[in-house]
Amino acid sequence: MTTLSPEAFAGHTPMMQQYLRIKADHPDTLVFYRMGDFYELFFEDAEKAARLLDLTLTQRGASAGTPIKMAGVPHHAVEQYLAKLVKMGESVAICEQIGDPATSKGPVERKVVRVVTPGTLTDAALLSDKNDVYLLAMCTGHNKRGVAVNIGLAWLNLASGALRLAEIEPDQLGAALERIRPAEILTADGATDTVPAGAGAIKRVPAWHFDIASGTQRLCDQLDVAGLDGFGAHSLTSACGAAGALLLYAAATQGQQLRHVRSLKVENETEYIGLDPATRRNLELTETLRGTESPTLYSLLDTCCTTMGSRLLRHWLHHPPRASVAAQSRQQAIGALLDAPADASLDALRSALRQIADVERITGRLALLSARPRDLSSLRDTFAALPALRERISAIVANADALTRVDAALAPPAECLDLLTSAIAPEPAAMVRDGGVIARGYDAELDELRDISENCGQFLIDLEARERTRTGIANLRVEYNKVHGFYIEVTRGQTDKVPDDYRRRQTLKNAERYITPELKTFEDKALSAQERALARERALYDGVLQALLPFIPECQRVASALAELDVLAAFAERARTLDWVAPTFTDEIGIEIEQGRHPVVEAQVEQFIANDCRFGAERKLLLITGPNMGGKSTFMRQTALIALMAYVGSYVPAKSACFGPIDRIFTRIGAADDLAGGRSTFMVEMTEAAAILNDATPQSLVLMDEIGRGTSTFDGLALAWAIARHLLAQNGCYTLFATHYFELTQLPAEFPQAANVHLSAVEHGHGIVFLHAVNEGPANQSYGLQVAQLAGVPAPVIRAARKHLAYLEQQSATQNTPQLDLFSAPPAAADELECADAPAVSAIPHPALEKLRDIDPDDLKPRDALDLLYELRTLVRSHDADGHA
């Protein structure tokens, strides 16, 4: 806690002194200071919030001679403002009134109850349903010479309690951050690690937070273990330092323990198929190249019925396991779901899943004691639905280990369900302060208070009837007014019948008003019943939250099983709807895809042409040629996507597919300037190519699209040849190599492991029809002019291009300049060449042909066409008369 000198408070009002003390502890955070029904911001915070949130900036008085600038937001709408600020990367300290204004001398006691930051969100209103939010800490490990040898990472999904550790090479930081996508990154003050732009909001914390010994102990305390050997994290010193800083920061933002962070997973490089940032972008797994969410592989696959399933699916797509065992287990479960009997059909199962709440995030809020009443009622209703869901699963678990495991994990926590059923009203109010949250029968005192509040009128009627009978006073009345409260009124002529326990409260001209001990007791209860009922309900609700804490592990178990079941059911639905098949796996080198289809493109077009793709020990590189728009990039991407889908555990869009081991997928497809990084298109292209050449192994799948096009023709061709040769001779990886350099089609003559394939097209007049079929052998041309015409290039430009193309082809045929051949021996000196005389070909074009080339028939009127015909005849006769052939 920051201590301010007395001089800092001089001249300030007591309330502003209180604010300044709180602000001193949160200097880099906006402080939302509760005052009545508003959260107020002062001074610089007010100016900043007014600018960011478009609030009205006001000025109210002065403190210590300084004008008090203010801006505020209503407490009931605070979440929408928090959401905007968090999206901008800001953090907000929520300062609440915790004292009683009625009993406080001076300012009401206030304190910061939580800090909302981009990486520590748990409120449903601040979270995206289908995206996880991660807080990440990074700690660099150094050797004795002070050289960085690794970077320890720890990242936490506070909404679910999932904590992970990893240690990576320093040059892998960008790829790791692209995979994890943290919302907030903790680094040490003075750290020199360069975090890629846009990777997440950066938060600097004191360097001592990353102390390895303290971090290891803090991690053990959090997990309630003596050591980390059981998690495989005992040797991850840098990661433990990062975890210590992360846990310290997360607990501080919540102002309490992280009760739901009870497990740890260590990720290592060899566990998942490697996907670098370029590959994730180019394959458009969860985001298109234009930055939209659809159409992507994720948007196609995500027919999940729960938000938990959608989030798990996203995680699976970015973490395809290298070992095929996990994929085979998932595909086995998909097959069982597709073959389910009628009474446990896939549709019935998915219908039941649609009724399931977001147990994962509700559990997170429960652990932080911030769960709202409807969270608990949703949790109760979900647990109550589990037995029926398990009945459907039990009918189809045969020969499906994944479903058997899920079924066992879905056993409802009986004690938890009993507590929720007895304590929470069937349809509770949204907030505890509104009342009606605790079920009737759970607490006798609350029921009595409610009865008093709700049945006051009936009690008075009953009391009046009893007192008339007891006293014999027929006109006795029980009434109420705001001045005197409840009373029994007796006319003056009947006062002699008043019992001894009546105490006079007021004398009127014609009547006396009394109160009895019973009525006084009721009055005390009735006048404060509603207020006391709300207070009692708040206390009971807090008690229910505390009583539910021991069930957090069981809730997490159920949430994990529900999410997995939902993803498997979504995979089964996609397989059935889109006619996908189960792939197979082998330990031998190779990829065999028969009639494969691009899953996303197929969903966007009426008809998709399926193609085969085959790799093996003797076939490692496919040189792909053919026209632009012919489907080269689609064919390449579909191969990678089918492979990734297979290892994720999905069925795949093909007639059949078999995969050998795959350790990484690389792509070099398309390029753009990196203006912020000062890199040209060609530099970006070469950087990606360098990463592939340095890291690809014989088990890697590489997609190379038109490498070398960003520089001069000869430079590009030479680079493309050398890169292809290196991929074959050194890396030995599966490579799809698309190119317009037809000289490269000679590569298989030198390397039998290379093969030519091409995308077919048919020329029709000056147009072209793309067949999108992959055939063996090289293409004969690229059809560039036809594609340009399809793109809408003006007709005069196309005509000029055709004219120049004819000239270039004519020059090539008449001159002694052989086409560049990178695969032959270097050419001899010019005087050593023996060249036969080339046949003479007139370089003077026929004037009639020249005239015809400049004509656009669509622009001719009938009369103009006739005149032109006569003109052409004249040109032909004149040309012949001059003795030209």
Curated annotation (Swiss-Prot):
InterPro entries attached to this UniProt entry: DNA_mismatch_repair_MutS, DNA_mismatch_repair_MutS-lik_N, DNA_mismatch_repair_MutS/MSH, DNA_mismatch_repair_MutS_C, DNA_mismatch_repair_MutS_clamp, DNA_mismatch_repair_MutS_core, DNA_mismatch_repair_MutS_N, DNA_mismatch_repair_MutS_sf
Pfam families: MutS_I, MutS_II, MutS_III, MutS_IV, MutS_V
Gene Ontology MF terms: ATP binding; ATP-dependent DNA damage sensor activity; damaged DNA binding; mismatched DNA binding
Binding sites annotated in the UniProt record for ATP: G626, P627, N628, M629, G630, G631, K632, S633
UniProt GO cellular component terms: cytosol
Signal peptide residue numbers: none
Disulfide bridge map: none
Keyword Electron transport assigned: no
NCBIfam families hit by this protein: mutS1, PRK05399.1
UniProt record similarity statement: Belongs to the DNA mismatch repair MutS family.
Protein name, UniProt field: DNA mismatch repair protein MutS
Gene name for this UniProt entry: mutS
